[in-house]
Amino acid sequence: MARDFPLERVRNIGIAAHIDAGKTTTTERILFYSGVVHKIGEVHDGAAVTDWMDQERERGITITAAAISTSWQDHRINIIDTPGHVDFTIEVERSMRVLDGVIAVFCAVGGVQPQSETVWRQADRYSVPRMVFVNKMDRTGADFLKVNKQIKDRLKANALPIQLPIGAEGDLTGIIDLVANKAYLYKNDLGTDIEEAPIPSEMEEEAAEWRNKLMESVAENDEELIEIFLETGELSTEQLKKGIREGVLKHGLVPVLCGSAFKNKGVQLVLDAVVDYLPAPVDVKPIQGVLPSGKEDVRPSDDNAPFSALAFKVMSDPYGKLTFVRMYSGVLSKGSYVMNSTKDAKERISRLVILKADEREEVDELRAGDLGAVLGLKNTTTGDTLCNTDDPIVLETLFIPEPVISVAVEPKTKGDMEKLSKALTALSEEDPTFRVSTDPETNQTVIAGMGELHLEILVDRMLREFKVEANIGAPQVSYRETIRSSSKGEGKYARQTGGKGQYGHVIIEMEPAEVGKGFEFVNKIVGGAVPKEYIGPASNGMKETCESGVLAGYPLIDVKVTLVDGSFHDVDSSEMAFKIAGSMAFKDGVKKCNPVLLEPMMKVEVESPDDFLGSVIGDLSSRRGQVEGQSVDDGLSKVQAKVPLAEMFGYATQLRSMTQGRGIFSMEFANYEEVPRNVAEAIISKNQGNS
């Protein structure tokens, strides 16, 4: 089957931003103008196409990254609409991993918010080229150039306006296109009747000034264009487009557009810019991976290359399990067998679909550069690589943040225990930041996630989709343990009970690992002191012991263990004996390595009228918060602080009463830090008292 669109005319883009910047409305308008939907759906009416879960339609926020295909100007555009709420960071993270370009949406009033910074960092992590759409230009207080300056200052981006609004707030009547040097005036409410016109005389001077800045910035990055610009003082529309595109692909500049998705102004120009400036799959670096030999390799974006794809999302729905994939190379056909190289398992492709939110179109194949979904995969989860059985490769996977909050959960009726277990398994398959475990002491089922809203929505889904009513305990902080110094550890397990005995013996060196490494194991056994077949079990014994630290039973992270020596017995040694010896050595070593307790620290931003600034700062300090920045603008104060999550429960209520209901705050995970000694002692004694 031939391609519908050549690879050069494919765009895989994400629409990302902070909450309430208008991402989903922007996506809806894109679908309307490109002909996918014939009626505009509003988020606040609960009718948005991309918000297809019941909870999304009720809450007016996007929870899961919905993938949709559309076309514009003879280009295929695959769009992922991502959530702006920090509890759903993994959805943004996994979509960034598979995208080629991003439209970052900012509110013309709110500007750069803490969540905008998080999304920007995620795009930086995966080197995703981007453009900006400053939305809500119809709102009171809208200021396009102020937001442009914030993007430059706070996100350190070379933000370059390629448009100017004509009017603002209630008088937004059109948009000046600085590249084409003309104006577009909107003549009807639906935004379908657009008049191309000269730039209004009262804005000619301002437009000329900004066009000159645009030409200078674009020329700076291109030797050929700088010569033309220095000679003639002018660049043509085509030269500007070429220069902007090259600047975007090299991460040298970020074009900034404006409009109001809700008022149907500026969205078609955003689509034009996607086609003109954002990369096709062939414009970005080929995906890297590792061959079975351990050698690094790349897969070019080409239908004729060996097949490779990354599973970036798993979802259960009434028709079965849907696995979303980004095709990097080759062709994937319905009915074929492929290899999951991450898990070394064979999978059969029963059906392939392209999604239009909750509608699906069945296809016979997916090709390099496509975003689609597979039905029928049994073993594949988020972050796994699918490839040809003859040409195996494991692609770079996703960064998955640690959960920061946990609650105990139990079914309201004993008979629902099995249903609860099935529901939790299905939900954790879909969402790698949602973890399920059993407390060994209380035997309670514990669920952990990225925040209270995250867990609340998952519990809600258990009721709606799996018909399980559950009782939820009070939220608990997910503490961690780590070590601060190095030491040796030894574990010898010897049992003789008549007949065949048990013998395993290992000596290890322990030291702190780099932050984020988790458990790192290095084998330095020489001369066969520990046979090869027992090294894996010894490592597994240590890794399992990591799950429960020595201070208060919390998981131990960022520990490097080097296996240096040991001994074995020809008859009595076994995998189990070495697993136990590994665990004993680990426990012995960790006690001597100055273990400490860690707690999740949250990046908090509080916005309130400046009369309450003193109270807000005082309250944050009383919560062990470190104030990192503050500003006052137009009578509104903003405070940035780092506060332990343990101190933030109930903060929303306290802030409301402290600011007479006029304060708002946002919170996101920053990092794990050591708990002060007096606080740690209380946590440790409480946990030891419970055990």
UniProtKB/Swiss-Prot annotation:
Keywords: Cytoplasm, Elongation factor, GTP-binding, Nucleotide-binding, Protein biosynthesis. Its main location: cytoplasm. InterPro entries: EFG_II, EFG_III, EFG_III/V, EFG_IV, EFG_V, EFG_V-like, EFTu-like_2, G_TR_CS. GO terms for molecular function: GTP binding; GTPase activity; translation elongation factor activity. It holds the Pfam family GTP_EFTU_D2. It is found in: Cytoplasm. Catalyzes the GTP-dependent ribosomal translocation step during translation elongation. During this step, the ribosome changes from the pre-translocational (PRE) to the post-translocational (POST) state as the newly formed A-site-bound peptidyl-tRNA and P-site-bound deacylated tRNA move to the P and E sites, respectively. Catalyzes the coordinated movement of the two tRNA molecules, the mRNA and conformational changes in the ribosome. PANTHER family: RIBOSOME-RELEASING FACTOR 2, MITOCHONDRIAL, TRANSLATION ELONGATION FACTOR G-RELATED. This is Elongation factor G. The gene is fusA.
